[in-house]
Amino acid sequence: MGITVRNLQKRFGDFTALDNVSLDFPPGELVALLGPSGCGKTTLLRVIAGLEHADAGQVVLQGLDVASVGARDRQVGFVFQHYALFRHMTVFENVAFGLRVKPRRERPSEAAIREKVHELLKLVQLDWLAQRYPSELSGGQRQRIALARALAVEPKVLLLDEPFGALDAKVRKELRGWLRRLHDDLHISTIFVTHDQEEALEVADRIVVLNRGHVEQVGSPQDVYDHPQSAFVYEFLGAANRLPGTVAGRGFVAEGAAAPTEVD
C-alpha cells in the first residue's frame, strides 16, 4: 500500500511537532524516519496510524484520505517501542488477540486462528514459546512476538516505533538483520522510527531525516550519507570536518582568507 502525507501540521501547546510535512512512501518499501528526540518522527508515525490527529493536512492510504477513518479501520499494524504485550496472556494468546477481537462477521474460525498464529510464530522463529508468558521472554523475543501480533491482522502497512531501542547493542544488531530479511520475504510497506544512524543506514531502502518538525532530506542511505543537503544532515549522520566559506568565481574563501583553490 502506498502512503502519502500532505502539508501535515501538528502542535502540542506551543510546541510544533510537525510543520508542513509532505512525503510519499511507495508500496513495499522499508523506510526509516531518522532524527533526534523531539524532531517529530514518532508523531508522524502516530498520525499515519490514526493514534494522533493532525491539526491540518492529509494522510492518504492507497488513494483514500483517511482523516475520518479510525485507527482500527486503517489496516495498519503498529509495534510500540516497549512492546505493549499483555502480561496476563501467553505468547499464543497475544498473537491471536487481534484476530479474536474482530467483528463477528470478519472473525476467523478458532481453527483458522490457531493455524494463523502457529504460522506467524514459525515466521518469527518462536513457535516453541507459544505457551510462555511475556515475563518469561527476553527483550528480543518480546519484540518479535509484538511484531507477530501486528502481522496477525494482515495489515497493509507496518509501523514500528523505535523497535530495537530498548535492547542491548548485540541483540539490536541481530534483529536489524532479521527485520530486513523478514521485510524482503513479506514485501509489506514498512515505516520505522529510529534515532540510530547506523540502524537506518543498514536496514532501510530510504531514509527520511527529520529535524524540528521539518523534513531535512529524503533519499537512499547512500545518497543521504554521501550527499547531505544541509549542515544538520551531515553533522547528525556522523563526524565530519566542516570548513565554513564561500565560493567566489573558481576560488574558495575560507575564514576570510583567500586561496587560489580550483573548484570544479
Swiss-Prot record:
Chief site of localization: membrane
GO terms assigned for molecular function: ABC-type sulfate transporter activity; ABC-type thiosulfate transporter activity; ATP binding; ATP hydrolysis activity
Subcellular location, record wording: Cell inner membrane
Positions of ATP binding: 35-42
Keywords: ATP-binding, Cell inner membrane, Cell membrane, Membrane, Nucleotide-binding, Sulfate transport, Translocase, Transport
One cellular component term from this protein's GO annotations in UniProt: ATP-binding cassette (ABC) transporter complex
Bilayer topology: Peripheral membrane protein
InterPro entries: AAA+_ATPase (IPR003593), ABC_SmlMolc_Importer (IPR050093), ABC_transporter-like_ATP-bd (IPR003439), ABC_transporter-like_CS (IPR017871), P-loop_NTPase (IPR027417), Sulph_transpt1 (IPR005666)
Residue span(s) of domain ABC transporter: 3-237
Reactions performed catalytically: sulfate(out) + ATP + H2O = sulfate(in) + ADP + phosphate + H(+); thiosulfate(out) + ATP + H2O = thiosulfate(in) + ADP + phosphate + H(+)
EC number: 7.3.2.3
The protein's enzyme class: translocase
Subunit structure: The complex is composed of two ATP-binding proteins (CysA), two transmembrane proteins (CysT and CysW) and a solute-binding protein (CysP).
Function: Part of the ABC transporter complex CysAWTP involved in sulfate/thiosulfate import. Responsible for energy coupling to the transport system.
PANTHER family from the UniProt entry: SPERMIDINE/PUTRESCINE IMPORT ATP-BINDING PROTEIN POTA, SPERMIDINE_PUTRESCINE IMPORT ATP-BINDING PROTEIN POTA
Listed NCBIfam families: 3a0106s01 (TIGR00968)
Family: Belongs to the ABC transporter superfamily. Sulfate/tungstate importer (TC 3.A.1.6) family.
Stated name of the protein: Sulfate/thiosulfate import ATP-binding protein CysA
Organism: Burkholderia cepacia (Pseudomonas cepacia)
Gene for this chain: cysA
